[in-house]
């Protein structure tokens, strides 16, 4: 049976596309990364819910929804935690990062959300992540990194990209160490270096 390289499709903006792209690149996946300008009617008909992102595996398996894609990729690499409790915390972290950090940050960057939201998120979510790392070393506990750590890193990286670096200054040493760990990964370093600029800052 002929197989093709996996492919991932999303726009140039980071937002929800960055999480699967970071995950794929972290594991050194050889995949075709499609930066989509717009979704025409024909393309939309091929999408399960009429929207991106879209991941197509080498065997033709198609998957949409950011978190489902990331968990599918992570599962292939035993990156979802070893115990039921770790996996539950991974799910908890994924939901918090996606719904309470990435989306509001994007909305502020787009100008449709009050900037005061950023201070609340930093004091509530990033402080919580910092405290967890100070106590446990890894977000989900356990003895190794999981998708929860990668999600927290992406959120931290994204907020710096959005221009909030000075709000983090000297406050989150464990998050800084987490960022250094993931950005030392060859695949992630190459992705950050070579990804196109959306021109929109988000």
From Swiss-Prot:
Catalyzed reaction equations: RX + glutathione = an S-substituted glutathione + a halide anion + H(+)
Origin superkingdom: Eukaryota
Single Gene Ontology BP annotation: glutathione metabolic process
Molecular functions per Gene Ontology: glutathione transferase activity
Gene3D superfamilies given in the database record: 1.20.1050.130
EC number: 2.5.1.18
One GO cellular component, as annotated: phagocytic vesicle
SUPFAM superfamilies: GST C-terminal domain-like, Thioredoxin-like
Domain GST N-terminal per the UniProt entry, residue ranges: 4-81
Residues that bear N-acetylthreonine: 2
Record key words, sorted: Acetylation, Transferase
Family from the record: Belongs to the GST superfamily. Alpha family.
Main function: Conjugation of reduced glutathione to a wide number of exogenous and endogenous hydrophobic electrophiles.
Record's protein name: Putative glutathione S-transferase alpha-1
Species in which this protein is naturally found: Dictyostelium discoideum
